């Protein structure tokens, strides 16, 4: 499985997931109406949001977290 780790104006950076990590995730943490912190990568289980300003989406196909 190949997941996106960074998505910038210069293009995307990907990572081949290690054995046992068969999901990609994208985590959006809303700081304010102008700024959102985004984290992407591989995971074994889909993480749960830690607060109401955070959303997490998991998927299992190549680059699905772009």
UniProtKB/Swiss-Prot annotation:
Quick check: keyword NAD in the entry?
no
The disulfides recorded in the entry are: 3-24, 17-42, 46-58, 59-64
- Asked if the record carries the keyword Disulfide bond, the reply is yes
Under the heading PROSITE patterns, the entry gives: SNAKE_TOXIN
Q: What is its main location?
A: secreted
UniProt keywords (A-Z) are: Disulfide bond, G-protein coupled receptor impairing toxin, Secreted, Toxin
Q: Which Pfam families match?
A: Toxin_cobra-type
Coiled coil feature spans? none
| Comment field (misc) | Negative results: does not show interaction with adrenergic receptors (ADRA1A, ADRA1B, ADRA1D, ADRB1, ADRB2), dopaminergic receptors (DRD1, DRD2, DRD4, DRD5), histaminic receptors (HRH1, HRH3, HRH4), muscarinic receptors (CHRM1, CHRM2, CHRM3, CHRM4, CHRM5), and serotoninergic receptors (HTR1A, HTR2A, HTR2B, HTR2C, HTR5A, HTR6, HTR7).
Q: Family assignment?
A: Belongs to the three-finger toxin family. Short-chain subfamily. Aminergic toxin sub-subfamily.
Protein name as annotated: Rho-elapitoxin-Da1b
